[in-house]
Amino acid sequence: DYKQLEYEMHLLHNEYIGELRLGASTTIAQYVLPPLLGNFIAKFPQVNLSLINGNSRGVETALQEHRIDLGLVEGIFRLPNLKYTSFLQDELVAVVHAHTKLDIQDEITPEDLPNIPLVLRERGSGTLDVFERALSQHNLKLSSLNVMMYLGSTESIKLFLEHTDCMGIVSIRSVHKELVAGNLRVIEIKGMPMQREFNFVQLQGQEGGLSQVFMRFAGHHSKSL
């Protein structure tokens, strides 16, 4: 289409100049964006790129307050004055440390969850939103679970698991290295899938410009992420 042709012509002449302020949820900022940002800066050296990170609700607030131009969030809730565009698929998994003293099988049921000590992401995080929604499919609530701690980042959860006998709920993208190294193991929660989407988020009516350039660039590179 015309926009795609225009995008490719600008690419050819490397004509993109200006400032692009990104905001991304913690999981996306830590585990998805770094290689993408590096490639983008190499391709568009005249674009002044900046990134802030926080949980998904915080990113949406920053967008509404015009502190950023484009957000990337992982939640399932939608605000009516924002436009959401799908970017990547993700999945949450339950993990324990490889040397945990928890008496836990490799496969459990949702009904087992109230008996297992948990460490979870904080309120306002997309990760907790998705976990709560999955619980509700089995008539379970957070208040019925044994939550030891709510922490502000996945890295904090992984460190907590090293020193505490409990189970964490995190993005599969965040634990790839630990699973390969054998430091963590996945516990399957039977019949409780926790798929989600990472989404771009923009103010309604403010689409275009460098935000659109970044979204197109990310779309072209999404298969390698």
Where are these regions (language model features)?
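Secondary-structure junction motif
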Residues: P117-N139, G208-G209, L225
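A late-sequence structural motif
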Residues: V32, I187-L225
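Flexible hinge/capping segments at coil-to-helix
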Residues: H13, L82-V119, R123, Q212
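Short beta-strand->loop
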Residues: K83-V93, N146, L179-M194
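Central regulatory/effector-binding core of bacterial HTH transcription factors
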Residues: H13-P80
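Short, well-ordered beta-strand segments
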Residues: E19-G23, G71, V95, V119, ...
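Hydrophobic hinge/microswitch elements
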Residues: N55-E60, Q64-I68, V73-E74, S136, ...
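Alpha-helical linker/hinge and terminal dimerization helices associated
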Residues: D1-H13
